[in-house]
C-alpha cells in the first residue's frame, strides 16, 4: 500500500442543471489549455459515455468517469490520481445540477459529493437568459446549500447583451458574493444533441474546427487565468491504493472489443482493467468481415439503431459472431451490444437483421424506456459474476425488447428496469447480454472473472 500526498491542480466545471453549457465550457477550456501547451487530464462526473469522447478529442487523453453511486470513494481517488500522471491540470466536467443525486435527498451520486471526495474547487455554469437579480438568488442558494462545497466562482451563460451582462454580473457579485469568472453570449455555439444526449464525437467530421471555435469563445469570454489559479490552489490529496502489476501471462489471452462509431460506449477504466490480464484486439462492426483470433468478445453500448442498415449489410461478421457465441466462447454485451446479438432491430427506417444469437427482438421508441442507476443481484454464476454478487451500474436506452423464445437470466433487478422490469442479463452458452452498463472499478473481480473464463476456453 502506498500513501500518496499529491498537489494536483484541479477544478470542477459544474452546472445549475442540464443543458446550461457545462460541456461547451469544459471542452472549450480543455482545448484552450492544450493549445497553450498544457497537458490536460479530463474527467466526467457520472456515468455518461458521450462527453468523455469529446474530452478525448479536445485533449488527446482518455477521460475518466468519476461516479460516486457506482464507485467507492477509494476507487474514485484511485482512478483520479492514477490517470493524472503526466498531466498539468485536471478539468472535471459535472453532470446535471451540482446537487442532483441518485435519490434526491442524500448527496449520493452528485457532483457535489465527488467534488468533496476530490477536495476540488467548483466553478458553476448558470443559464441566466432573461434573468438579472433572480440569478443572484439562484447562485446564493447554491453557495449556501452546502458550505463544504468549494464554490469559487460562476460563469454566466447565454446573456443577451452587454447591458444584460453588466446587470447580472453586478447582481451576482454584490448580492450573492460569488465571483463572476465569465459571461458568455447566447447562440455563440450549439452542441448537437440526440436522444441519449450529445451526438458522439465519432460522428463529427469537423471536430477539430468545432473544438477550436469553442476554445476561442472561452478565451474571449471567460477568465481562464483565474480558473487556472483556482485549480492550482486546490488542497493536496491523500490517497491510499495498491500499485497493481500487469499479469505477465496476459499475452496468452486475447479479448476482442467491438469499438467503432456504432459501439463506442466503453469506460476506459474497463478496458484498462481487462488489459492488465489480456491483450485487447479491436474490431469494427461495419468494415471488418471476420473476427480476429480472440478468446472472448466484449461488445459495449452505442447507437446500433443509427447504423442498423450497415450492421445488417455486414452479414459475414454477423455470422462469425454467431458462430463464436455458439461455440461457447465468452461474450459480454451491454445495451447496444445486447441489441446487436438479438434477432432484429426495428427503427423508424424499418426492421434490420442482427446477429440472431439471443432470443429477442428490439424496437426503438421516441421516449426513453429506462433511465438511471441500477442495482442487480446475480441469480446464477455467469462470466462476470458469481452467484448472489451485487452488480451496480446504470441504464439509459430508448429501445424495448421482446423475447422470441425461452430465456435464462443472470440477474434479478433490485433497482432499475433491465429487460422486463424484473430481470436482466440473458444467458446462452457462454454469452451474457444485458441492458446495464457496468463500471469494472465498482468490483475488480468482474474483469478478472471475465478473463479467467476466456483462459478456460483456450
UniProtKB/Swiss-Prot annotation:
Keyword field: ATP-binding, Cobalamin biosynthesis, Glutamine amidotransferase, Ligase, Magnesium, Nucleotide-binding
Cofactor(s) of this protein: Mg(2+)
Site (Increases nucleophilicity of active site Cys): 437
Domain GATase cobBQ-type: 254-445
EC category: ligase
CDD domains named in the record: CobB_N, GATase1_CobB
Job of this protein: Catalyzes the ATP-dependent amidation of the two carboxylate groups at positions a and c of cobyrinate, using either L-glutamine or ammonia as the nitrogen source.
UniProt domain comment: Comprises of two domains. The C-terminal domain contains the binding site for glutamine and catalyzes the hydrolysis of this substrate to glutamate and ammonia. The N-terminal domain is anticipated to bind ATP and cobyrinate and catalyzes the ultimate synthesis of the diamide product. The ammonia produced via the glutaminase domain is probably translocated to the adjacent domain via a molecular tunnel, where it reacts with an activated intermediate.
Protein name as annotated: Cobyrinate a,c-diamide synthase
Organism: Archaeoglobus fulgidus (strain ATCC 49558 / DSM 4304 / JCM 9628 / NBRC 100126 / VC-16)
Lineage: Archaea, Methanobacteriati, Methanobacteriota, Archaeoglobi, Archaeoglobales
Gene name of this polypeptide: cbiA
Amino acid at each position: 500500500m502506498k500513501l500518496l500526498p499529491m498537489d494536483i491542480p484541479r477544478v470542477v466545471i459544474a452546472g445549475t442543471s442540464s443543458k446550461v453549457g457545462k460541456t461547451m465550457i469544459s471542452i472549450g477550456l480543455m482545448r484552450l489549455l492544450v493549445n497553450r501547451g498544457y497537458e490536460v487530464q479530463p474527467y466526467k462526473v457520472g456515468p455518461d459515455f458521450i462527453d468523455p469522447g469529446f474530452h478525448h478529442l479536445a485533449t488527446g487523453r482518455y477521460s475518466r468517469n468519476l461516479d460516486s453511486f457506482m464507485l467507492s470513494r477509494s476507487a474514485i481517488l484511485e482512478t483520479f490520481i492514477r490517470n493524472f500522471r503526466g498531466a498539468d491540470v485536471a478539468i472535471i466536467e459535472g453532470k446535471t445540477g451540482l446537487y442532483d443525486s441518485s435519490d434526491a435527498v442524500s448527496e449520493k451520486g452528485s457532483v457535489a459529493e465527488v467534488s468533496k471526495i476530490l477536495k476540488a474547487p467548483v466553478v458553476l455554469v448558470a443559464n441566466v437568459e432573461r434573468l438579472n437579480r433572480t440569478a443572484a438568488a439562484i447562485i446564493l442558494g447554491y453557495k449556501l446549500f452546502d458550505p463544504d462545497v468549494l464554490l469559487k466562482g460562476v460563469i454566466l451563460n447565454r446573456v443577451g447583451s452587454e447591458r444584460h451582462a453588466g446587470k447580472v454580473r453586478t447582481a451576482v457579485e454584490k448580492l450573492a458574493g460569488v465571483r463572476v469568472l465569465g459571461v458568455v453570449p447566447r447562440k455563440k455555439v450549439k452542441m448537437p444533441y440526440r436522444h441519449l444526449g450529445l451526438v458522439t464525437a465519432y460522428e463529427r467530421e469537423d471536430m477539430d474546427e468545432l473544438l477550436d471555435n469553442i476554445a476561442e469563445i472561452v478565451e474571449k469570454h471567460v477568465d481562464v487565468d483565474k480558473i487556472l489559479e483556482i485549480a492550482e490552489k486546490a488542497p493536496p490529496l491523500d490517497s491510499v491504493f495498491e500499485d497493481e502489476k500487469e499479469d505477465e501471462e496476459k499475452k496468452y489471452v486475447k479479448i476482442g472489443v467491438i469499438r467503432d462509431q456504432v459501439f463506442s460506449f466503453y469506460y476506459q477504466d474497463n478496458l484498462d482493467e481487462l488489459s492488465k490480464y489480456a491483450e485487447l484486439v479491436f474490431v469494427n462492426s461495419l468494415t471488418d468481415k471476420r473476427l480476429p483470433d480472440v478468446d472472448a468478445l466484449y461488445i459495449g453500448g452505442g447507437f446500433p439503431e443509427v447504423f442498423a442498415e450497415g450492421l445488417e449489410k455486414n452479414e459475414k461478421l454477423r455470422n462469425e459472431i454467431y458462430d463464436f457465441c455458439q461455440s461457447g466462447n465468452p461474450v459480454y454485451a451491454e445495451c447496444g451490444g445486447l441489441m446487436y446479438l438479438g434477432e432484429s432491430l426495428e427503427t423508424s427506417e424499418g426492421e434490420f437483421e442482427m446477429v440472431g444469437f439471443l432470443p429477442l427482438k428490439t424496437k426503438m421508441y421516441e421516449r426513453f424506456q429506462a433511465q438511471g442507476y441500477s442495482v442487480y443481484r446475480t441469480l446464477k454464476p455467469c462470466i462476470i459474476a458469481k452467484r448472489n454478487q451485487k452488480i451496480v451500474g446504470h441504464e439509459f436506452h430508448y429501445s424495448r425488447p421482446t423475447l422470441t423464445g425461452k430465456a435464462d437470466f443472470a440477474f434479478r433487478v433490485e433497482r432499475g428496469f433491465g429487460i422486463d422490469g424484473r430481470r436482466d442479463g440473458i444467458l446462452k452458452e457462454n454469452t451474457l447480454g444485458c441492458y446495464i452498463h457496468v463500471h469494472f472499478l465498482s468490483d475488480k473481480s468482474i474483469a478478472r472473472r471475465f478473463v479467467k473464463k476466456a483462459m478456460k476456453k483456450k
